[in-house]
UniProtKB/Swiss-Prot annotation:
<dbReference type="InterPro" id="IPR002136">
    <property type="entry name" value="Ribosomal_uL4"/>
</dbReference>
<comment type="similarity">
    <text>Belongs to the universal ribosomal protein uL4 family.</text>
</comment>
<keyword id="KW-0687">Ribonucleoprotein</keyword>
<dbReference type="GO" id="GO:0006412">
    <property type="term" value="P:translation"/>
</dbReference>
<comment type="function">
    <text>One of the primary rRNA binding proteins, this protein initially binds near the 5'-end of the 23S rRNA. It is important during the early stages of 50S assembly. It makes multiple contacts with different domains of the 23S rRNA in the assembled 50S subunit and ribosome.</text>
</comment>
<protein>
    <recommendedName>
        <fullName>Large ribosomal subunit protein uL4</fullName>
    </recommendedName>
</protein>
<dbReference type="GO" id="GO:0003735">
    <property type="term" value="F:structural constituent of ribosome"/>
</dbReference>
<dbReference type="Pfam" id="PF00573">
    <property type="entry name" value="Ribosomal_L4"/>
</dbReference>
<dbReference type="InterPro" id="IPR013005">
    <property type="entry name" value="Ribosomal_uL4-like"/>
</dbReference>
<keyword id="KW-0694">RNA-binding</keyword>
<comment type="function">
    <text>Forms part of the polypeptide exit tunnel.</text>
</comment>
<comment type="subunit">
    <text>Part of the 50S ribosomal subunit.</text>
</comment>
<dbReference type="InterPro" id="IPR023574">
    <property type="entry name" value="Ribosomal_uL4_dom_sf"/>
</dbReference>
<dbReference type="GO" id="GO:0005840">
    <property type="term" value="C:ribosome"/>
</dbReference>
<feature type="region of interest" description="Disordered">
    <location>
        <begin position="45"/>
        <end position="85"/>
    </location>
</feature>
<dbReference type="GO" id="GO:1990904">
    <property type="term" value="C:ribonucleoprotein complex"/>
</dbReference>
<keyword id="KW-0689">Ribosomal protein</keyword>
Amino acid sequence: MELKLLNSNGQEGAVVNASDVVFGRDYNEALIHQVVVAYQANARQGNRAQKDREQVKHTTKKPWRQKGTGRARAGMSSSPLWRGGGRIFPNSPDENFSHKVNKKMHRAGLCSIFSQLAREGRLSVVEDIVLEAPKTKLLADKFKAMGLDSVLVITDTVDENLYLASRNLPHVAVVEPRYADPLSLIYFKKVLVTKAAVAQIEELLS
């Protein structure tokens, strides 16, 4: 698989030969969907809480006697049938939302995403991205010259200047290959990978 190599002005020059195992896979929408949903589910935390009839603060006194009133029998006002009573199946902060995806499926899903990005022209390779200082304007001007506004940068090692400069740009993220997640790969309009990172991605996913 040949990937486009961009220069500092965003113009296409030479090409980089990449592994077909990682960058030349068929598009598998069902697998990609499963991997993305699992990633989102595993990022969820239990922050919902409701009370059952035991936790609701109510008296345990019987509202009225069992027989003779003509009304429906009732044991206590915390009953789920009553207004202000507890929930029958309350949401709990201990709820587990995680989805399990096998390692082979996860790797195959990432390969399918990388391959589709390459086919759509959303994946490009750069020699390296070097900044002289941790200035947001320097990085913003560099991406503007390359015609990029929403970009995920994957580098072999995250340079401190590059990382600090990218933090204040709303649609820019800088990660190492091992931290490239399926949701970010799909979310950003463009994915820039350094030449050294291409080899790392192939090693991780082959």
